[in-house]
Amino acid sequence: MSMVYANIFLAFIMSLMGLLMYRSHLMSSLLCLEGMMLSLFVMMTVTILSNHFTLASMAPIVLLVFAACEAALGLSLLVMVSNTYGTDYVQNLNLLQC
């Protein structure tokens, strides 16, 4: 495994550990999820470019679209929770159930 792959994998693991450790606030969880998606995007792009997979060249773009949709939904949920309760604690999400 080259150093590029090791660094990208380390970035993914650090984002995952951040998501597991700092899950009390919604904003920190969203930032960790974005870090995970960014490292996955870079890993897919580097792998596809280094192995010359021409048929899979659209996969990183699709992943980036899903990451943008996830970020938009997460930010709208963050705005809704912060307007309703005044804080961005994840424990407030259980109160949103009907």
UniProtKB/Swiss-Prot annotation:
The keyword Disulfide bond does not apply. Belongs to the complex I subunit 4L family. Its EC number is 7.1.1.2. Core subunit of respiratory chain NADH dehydrogenase (Complex I) which is composed of 45 different subunits. The chain crosses the membrane at residues 1-21, 29-49, 61-81. It is found in: Mitochondrion inner membrane. GO terms for molecular function: NADH dehydrogenase (ubiquinone) activity. This is NADH-ubiquinone oxidoreductase chain 4L. The gene is MT-ND4L. It comes from the Eukaryota. Its main location: mitochondrion. GO terms for biological process: ATP synthesis coupled electron transport. GO terms for cellular component: mitochondrial inner membrane; respiratory chain complex I. It is an enzyme of class 7 (translocase). It is a multi-pass membrane protein.
